[in-house]
């Protein structure tokens, strides 16, 4: 990078708390932790670890944090470990606890920013696993703009039962099968026990793996690191190398906002489209771009979708898991295909100091013939990307649908209206939803939920009952990366602020049309105007605590559901 970005000293920030007579009390605190006088002048590097025994996604992070700390020390830096929280989507799913998931994204970003800036750290390594660790950590990196790198905790390996690979979504779908009488109780219990065999994040191209792949494409994580399994030795080696790379970035003055540019975000979103990634990536990259002060809208996703095909056959709508993608060449192989087709910006710089083109220089031009995970651009799974932005009188600000793999790209049917996920789930489990229905779940948006719960439980139950292709679902909430089917989320404006989804009545005709990118309430304008005049805003569900704060400050989902948009 250019000289103006290079710090005069590698401890340019931390010297504020280590240098001079007035900082003797500060140094005394460091001596208490084993620092020596020769350590002052070395960069202080935060290691923000989301390790916990809350979830398998994060239960294997401590060895990575220890490895990073040791490698930082060897590279001449002072590691400073601190924790950041996590909320398990898989455990909170379908309960009140899920309301805290998206909230935790903001808490994670705020907590890392607080420690990095409060302690004048010269750099930071963020180590995360579960879904919201990913955007929360990246938002903190670009907010603070101190040299930083993201170390993904790694994917879980698949479970196995009766010759079938399993993952966490297998269990959610098994619930629907069991309720429908299509699954033996013994098999149901064995799937439950075997689906998650150890530590690591959920194994398909679900939200955590989507974001890790995107961070690699963004240039903020090392090549190949996003598809490694948590329990494999190469993940520890990659973590150590990440620490060494960060120390070099500190010396060069290479900062996150030098890397996370508009072009780099285009690269990341292109990889999300090519790999069939999660709808949550739309919400999270709106938030990351906002934190980085990069102009970015939901229409940018649609622009990229139209030119980037889906070339990776990944679950939930495909066949393979992240461990399979890793063996097939990982994200660098996918990026090489996109770069050679002119679909990536090769000049974007990465945390290594190399450009994207330089990083990919020695990657094979074509994927291996003996694998089926990565296709070529001449033989894609789908000619266009899968995350479509839909609009219509139900969602004038836009909403998100995952349209790949649908046998029936359109549905018009009677609305089955529910004012919470819980009410909808009760109806689904009671078998009151039938083929041709369009389920509307509202008051689950950023403000109304609050927290935009993910609707994996309802969608998986529908799939398990054999209704995944014949029932539509529309919500102002979100979907898990494991969701597939005729589903539309992030409907904006949300019901809580009087968005049109609040005006839908039981039995109204509703259309979802993926090809026309339309989500429409088939009711006349005059009738909708009458309903709008009669609508009254509901009382907040929470008046104290973190959920109340999030509800007060959260923006529309079309703006990323961020909490600092209009401060």
Curated annotation (Swiss-Prot):
For the protein in the UniProt heading, the enzyme class is: lyase
Q: Can you quote the record's cofactor note?
A: Binds 1 [2Fe-2S] cluster per subunit. This cluster acts as a Lewis acid cofactor.
- Has the keyword Transferase been applied to this entry? no
State which pathway it belongs to.
Amino-acid biosynthesis; L-isoleucine biosynthesis; L-isoleucine from 2-oxobutanoate: step 3/4; Amino-acid biosynthesis; L-valine biosynthesis; L-valine from pyruvate: step 3/4
Kindly list the positions annotated as binding [2Fe-2S] cluster: 57, 130, 202
GO MF terms held by the record: 2 iron, 2 sulfur cluster binding; dihydroxy-acid dehydratase activity; magnesium ion binding
Q: Which residues bind Mg(2+)?
A: 89, 131-132, 454
- N6-carboxylysine is carried by which residues? 132
- Identify the InterPro entries for this entry: DHAD_IlvD/Edd, Dihydro-acid_dehy_C, DihydroxyA_deHydtase, DiOHA_6PGluconate_deHydtase_CS, ILV_EDD_C, ILV_EDD_N, IlvD/EDD_N
One Pfam family, short name please? Answer: ILV_EDD_C
- Superkingdom: Bacteria
What HAMAP family does the database record attribute to this sequence?
A: IlvD
Subunit-level organization? Homodimer.
Family per record: Belongs to the IlvD/Edd family.
Protein name per Swiss-Prot or TrEMBL: Dihydroxy-acid dehydratase 1
Q: Which organism is it from?
A: Aromatoleum aromaticum (strain DSM 19018 / LMG 30748 / EbN1) (Azoarcus sp. (strain EbN1))
């Amino acid at each position: 990078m250019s000289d103006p970005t290079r710090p005069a000293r590698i401890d340019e920030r931390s010297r504020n708390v280590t240098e001079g007579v007035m900082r003797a009390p500060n140094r005394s605190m460091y001596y208490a932790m084993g620092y020596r006088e020769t350590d002052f002048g070395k960069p202080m590097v935060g290691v923000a670890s989301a390790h916990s025994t809350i979830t398998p996604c994060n239960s294997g992070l401590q060895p990575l944090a220890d490895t990073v700390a040791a490698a930082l020390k060897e590279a001449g830096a002072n590691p400073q470990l601190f924790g950041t929280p996590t909320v398990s989507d898989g455990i909170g799913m379908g309960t009140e606890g899920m309301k805290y998931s998206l909230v935790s994204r903001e808490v994670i970003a705020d907590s890392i920013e607080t420690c990095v800036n409060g302690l004048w750290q010269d750099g930071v390594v963020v180590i995360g696993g579960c879904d919201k660790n990913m955007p929360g950590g990246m938002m903190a990196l670009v907010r603070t703009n101190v040299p930083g790198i993201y170390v993904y905790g790694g994917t879980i390996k698949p479970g196995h039962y009766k010759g079938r690979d399993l993952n966490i979504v297998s269990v959610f779908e098994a619930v629907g099968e069991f309720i429908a009488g299509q699954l033996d109780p013994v098999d149901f219990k064995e799937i439950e026990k075997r689906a998650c065999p150890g530590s690591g994040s959920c194994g398909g191209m679900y939200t955590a793996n989507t974001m890790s792949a995107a961070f690699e494409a963004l240039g903020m994580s090392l090549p190949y690191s996003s598809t490694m399994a948590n329990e494999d030795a190469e993940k520890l080696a990659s973590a150590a190398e990440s620490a060494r790379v960060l120390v070099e970035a500190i010396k060069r003055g290479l900062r996150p906002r030098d890397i996370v540019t508009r072009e780099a975000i285009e690269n990341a979103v292109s990889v999300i489209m090519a790999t069939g990634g999660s709808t949550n990536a739309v919400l999270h990259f709106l938030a990351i771009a906002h934190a980085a002060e990069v102009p970015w809208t939901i229409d940018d996703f649609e622009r990229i979708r139209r030119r980037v095909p889906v070339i990776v056959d990944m679950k939930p709508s495909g066949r393979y898991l992240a461990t399979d993608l890793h063996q097939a060449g990982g994200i660098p192989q996918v990026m090489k295909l996109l770069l050679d087709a002119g679909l990536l910006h090769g000049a974007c710089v990465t945390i290594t100091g190399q450009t994207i083109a330089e990083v990919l220089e020695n990657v094979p031009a074509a994927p291996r013939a003996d694998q089926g995970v990565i296709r070529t651009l001449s033989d894609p799974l789908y000619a266009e990307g899968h995350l479509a932005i839909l609009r219509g009188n139900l969602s004038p600000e836009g909403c998100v649908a995952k349209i790949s793999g649908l046998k029936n790209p359109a549905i018009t049917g009677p609305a089955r209206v529910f004012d919470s996920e819980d009410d909808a789930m009760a109806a689904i489990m009671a078998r009151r939803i039938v083929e041709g229905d369009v389920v509307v779940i509202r008051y689950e948006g950023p403000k109304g939920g609050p927290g935009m719960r993910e609707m994996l439980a309802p969608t998986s139950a529908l799939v398990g009952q054999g209704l995944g292709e014949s029932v539509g679902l529309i919500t102002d909430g979100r979907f898990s990366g494991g969701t597939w089917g005729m589903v539309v989320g992030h409907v904006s404006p949300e019901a809580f602020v009087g968005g049109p989804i609040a005006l839908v009545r039981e039995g109204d005709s509703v259309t979802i049309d993926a090809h026309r990118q339309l989500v429409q309430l088939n009711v006349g304008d005059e009738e909708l105007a009458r309903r709008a005049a009669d609508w009254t805003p509901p009382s907040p569900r929470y008046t104290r605590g973190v959920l109340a704060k999030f509800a007060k400050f959260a923006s529309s989902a079309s703006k990323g559901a961020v909490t600092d948009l209009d401060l």
